[in-house]
Structures are given as structure tokens and as C-alpha cells.
Amino acid sequence: MSQNSNLMREVRLFENHSEREQMENLSELFAVLNALEHLEKMFSRDHVTADEYKTECFKLIDQYKVTMRLVHGATSIEEFAKKYRLHCPAAIERIREGRPITVKDDQGNVLKHIASIVEQFITFLDSLRLNTRAVDDLYPVLDDLYNAINSTSRVPIDANVTTKVKKWHDRLSSMAATDEISDDEARQMIFDTEGAYQSFQKALNEQKH
């Protein structure tokens, strides 16, 4: 009977919370690489459209970057794949390049887009500081900033940036062109926009390292 009890005993894969988190992170990394490998194969066989492939590929590459930071002891993707016997040459190649195969290395365009977003932030903040309060003057400037932020997946946009800009974009779009914002609203708008701008700059700096 005791022998049967030993056979039925639960096998523990970890001894504490830290080991459990490591196991979950390893599983997540394995799943992301496996999914990326399958995505590459599906695209090569025309099972997904170019747009679907591009969107999903960027998403998986971002998930890989986040998960890889959480895994302790994994020095490279090649080492991880070898250690856990994961055959994923296409996924490894995609991660090395850092972009879908359909996207060319347009670093120059990315830098131009970043410069455009920075310019839109500064222009909008300057308008507020110069006491511009009319909706028909503020909204076009904020709309340019909002569209610039949402027009690319190649530029790192923190959720905090999108949320704060969208908040005021929605607010102004619901007002009449002849309306004006109050000084209190302008003050809060400056505070939120500066916070969004700082988050944007922080995300850019983190991407460089």
C-alpha cells in the first residue's frame, strides 16, 4: 500500500515561489518561440496574410523581449533552444533581425517618425503654455500627435503615453469647435502631456540599452 502511495504522490517541479516563477517564465519563453516558429512556417505557406503575419510577428517579438528579461540564467536564445531541445531556426532568425521578414530595415524612417512625435508633443505643449484655449485651435494639434503615436508599431509606445493622450483627444473631440477649455483643464492637460512625453522618452532610452 505504501508503495502505491509513493507512486500516487504529486511530483513537485519547484520548491518555492521563486522557482515556480522561473518555471512559468521558461514555459512562456518556450511557448513564444514555438508560436513564432509556427507563424514563420504558416506565412511561408501562404496560410496567413502579410498584414496578419506582420502584426502577430511584432507581438511575439515583443513578448520574447519581455519574457527573456524575466528568465534567470538564459544568456542567449540559441543556448535556450539547445538546452530545451527546441528546434526553431526561423524563430531565432526573426528574433535576431528584430522585425518581420516583410519589414525592411527602415531605421531612417523610424528615426524620422520619432522626431515627428517629439515635434508634435512640443508643439501641443507650447500651444497650451501660450494660453491657447479654443478647441478649434487645440484639437488639430492634439489630433496630429494622437495620429502620430498610433500610426506605427516600430516606435516603442508605452501604454501610459497612449492613455494620457487619448484621454484629452476624446475630451476635445466631444466638445464644440467654439468651446474653450478652462485654465484648470489646461493645467491638467499640460501635466498629463508632459507625463506622456517623459514616458515616451524613457521608452526610447530603454530600447537603446
Curated annotation (Swiss-Prot):
List keywords of the entry alphabetically: Endosome, Protein transport, Transport
Q: Report which superkingdom the organism of origin falls in.
A: Eukaryota
Q: Does the keyword Protein transport apply?
A: yes
Which is a Pfam family this sequence falls into?
Answer: VPS28
Q: Indicate the segments forming the VPS28 N-terminal domain, all copies.
A: 1-105
Q: Which GO terms describe its molecular function?
A: protein-containing complex binding
Could you tell me where this protein is found in the cell? Endosome
Name the residues that span the membrane: none
- Residues in VPS28 C-terminal domain copies: 109-205
* Keyword set includes Metal-binding: no
Name one process (GO BP) from the record: protein transport to vacuole involved in ubiquitin-dependent protein catabolic process via the multivesicular body sorting pathway
Where is it found, in Gene Ontology cellular component terms? ESCRT I complex
PANTHER family linked to this entry: VACUOLAR PROTEIN SORTING 28, ISOFORM 2 VPS28, VACUOLAR PROTEIN SORTING-ASSOCIATED PROTEIN 28 HOMOLOG
Write out the similarity annotation: Belongs to the VPS28 family.
Q: How does it assemble?
A: Component of the ESCRT-I complex (endosomal sorting complex required for transport I).
| Function as written in the Swiss-Prot or TrEMBL entry | Component of the ESCRT-I complex, a regulator of vesicular trafficking process.
Output this protein's name.
Answer: Vacuolar protein sorting-associated protein 28 homolog
> Where does this protein come from, organism-wise?
Caenorhabditis briggsae
